[in-house]
Amino acid sequence: MGLIASAIAIGLAALGAGIGNGLIVSKTIEGTARQPEARGTLTSMMFVGVALVEALPIIAVVIAFMVQGK
């Protein structure tokens, strides 16, 4: 049962991160197209946002390993 729960947790975290990253990047491209002079600021903010979104799947993997180890 723990193996199935781990797989579901990792899969949903990866799905959410993929959707979140897609939204972040698309809005950054949209903002750059509207205001090209803000490209540097938008890009740096995009990388911060992507890093925060990617932290959740990493935490999910750690928790999944903890559930499997019990």
From Swiss-Prot:
Record's subunit section: F-type ATPases have 2 components, F(1) - the catalytic core - and F(0) - the membrane proton channel. F(1) has five subunits: alpha(3), beta(3), gamma(1), delta(1), epsilon(1). F(0) has three main subunits: a(1), b(2) and c(10-14). The alpha and beta chains form an alternating ring which encloses part of the gamma chain. F(1) is attached to F(0) by a central stalk formed by the gamma and epsilon chains, while a peripheral stalk is formed by the delta and b chains.
TM region positions: 4-24, 47-67
Subcellular location: Cell membrane
Molecular function terms from GO: lipid binding; proton-transporting ATP synthase activity, rotational mechanism
Entry keyword Cell cycle: no
Purpose of the protein: F(1)F(0) ATP synthase produces ATP from ADP in the presence of a proton or sodium gradient. F-type ATPases consist of two structural domains, F(1) containing the extramembraneous catalytic core and F(0) containing the membrane proton channel, linked together by a central stalk and a peripheral stalk. During catalysis, ATP synthesis in the catalytic domain of F(1) is coupled via a rotary mechanism of the central stalk subunits to proton translocation.
UniProt xrefs under CDD domains: ATP-synt_Fo_c_ATPE (cd18185)
Disulfide bonds: none
A Pfam family it matches: ATP-synt_C
Membrane topology term: Multi-pass membrane protein
Name by which UniProt lists this protein: ATP synthase subunit c
Assigned GO CC terms: plasma membrane; proton-transporting ATP synthase complex; proton-transporting two-sector ATPase complex, proton-transporting domain
Recorded superkingdom: Bacteria
Swiss-Prot/TrEMBL keywords: ATP synthesis, Cell membrane, CF(0), Hydrogen ion transport, Ion transport, Lipid-binding, Membrane, Transmembrane, Transmembrane helix, Transport
Entry-linked Gene3D superfamilies: F1F0 ATP synthase subunit C
Site (Reversibly protonated during proton transport) residue list: 54
